[in-house]
């Protein structure tokens, strides 16, 4: 791809981004990202979060999902969050910066969870996209498999899992895997998710 094509594509993305009504609303409300609205839509339909819950947030930065969940679980709730990128502090959120794919980071995250009964694991993780689906989709699927492994390790019986997945090779198999672990599984495409994006959200409840 030439520099001119990249520049044109980047300009289109920026124009679309800043004219996006959810981006504008997020800025007006002082929210960290438009992802806040995606989780709000999911909460309205699936009622995942309740006061006092313990929640694990994977791929947390810049903090849109954690910021939303704090409003739902209240002061007695707890969020353990992790991301490769830094994240400004949020009251009620225990943040660990590190690469979730690293075993030492995974171990540190599990230590922070400790004996807590985790009611929700949520993952908005995504790899750095190259624009080539044959490269991007396997990278993304690896991350969502790791998120599901976290569910196996820490999620309490009856707990819930919400994960961003990019449709493509491996999606159907992953969905079957989740259905074997949860009693109810839905695939959501929030209105606040860009229409041309491959992303969908799998919402799984009732950990077996």
Curated annotation (Swiss-Prot):
Catalysed reactions, semicolon-separated: uridine(2552) in 23S rRNA + S-adenosyl-L-methionine = 2'-O-methyluridine(2552) in 23S rRNA + S-adenosyl-L-homocysteine + H(+)
UniProt-annotated catalytic positions: 164 (proton acceptor)
EC id: 2.1.1.166
Keyword annotations of the record: Cytoplasm, Methyltransferase, rRNA processing, S-adenosyl-L-methionine, Transferase
Pfam families in the record: FtsJ
Binding site for S-adenosyl-L-methionine: 63, 65, 83, 99, 124
InterPro entries documented for this protein: RNA_methyltr_RlmE, RNA_MeTrfase_FtsJ_dom, rRNA-MeTfrase_E, rRNA_MeTrfase_gammaproteobac, SAM-dependent_MTases_sf
Molecular function in Gene Ontology: rRNA (uridine-2'-O-)-methyltransferase activity
Protein's cellular compartments: Cytoplasm
EC class: transferase
GO cellular component terms, A-Z: cytoplasm
Family in the record: Belongs to the class I-like SAM-binding methyltransferase superfamily. RNA methyltransferase RlmE family.
NCBIfam families: PRK11188.1 (NF008390), rrmJ (TIGR00438)
Biological role stated in the UniProt entry: Specifically methylates the uridine in position 2552 of 23S rRNA at the 2'-O position of the ribose in the fully assembled 50S ribosomal subunit.
Classification via HAMAP family: RNA_methyltr_E
Protein name stated in the entry: Ribosomal RNA large subunit methyltransferase E
